[in-house]
C-alpha cells in the first residue's frame, strides 16, 4: 500500500551522494532498479534520473517491520529511504559513480507500488518500438532516452537564452507550427 510523502524532503539525488557524505543522514527517492535478498541483508539499487545508488536493508538497523517491508519491494516500486551514508563493506562497484558507498536504511516508505513492467528499464535492451510507445512513461525512464531528453532541454534552454539576450521575443502561435490531427 502506498504511503504518504507528508514530511518527506529529498536531500540528495542518487549520484549526488558521495564518500564525502559518509556518516551523514540523507533522504533519497526513486525507483527500485534491482533487489537482491541475501537472507539477513537486502540490497536495492535505487534509480532516479541522475543514476543508481545502492541501499542496504539490515534488520538490525531498520528493525523487523522495516525489513519486512523491504522484503516486499519489487522492480519499479517508488520508494523514499532515510539512512546513513556508509562505505561499502563488500566489493566496490567501479561501474557506478556511487560504487564505493551505500545507504544503510533507517526508514523506508513505499510511495507507489508497481506491477511487473512489460520490458526492462535498462540501457541496451532491445524492445519493439510499438511496445515502447505504448508504455512511453516507462520508456522515458531508460537512461539512453533520458540523456537524449536532457540534451534536448539544454539546447532549447541555451537557444532561448541566446535569442532573449539578442532582444528577440518568443511568440507562440499555432500558425507557425503544424497542427496535429485528432488533437494528438
Which role fits each region the language model picked out?
Residues 1-184:
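Class II aminoacyl-tRNA synthetase catalytic cores and aaRS-like
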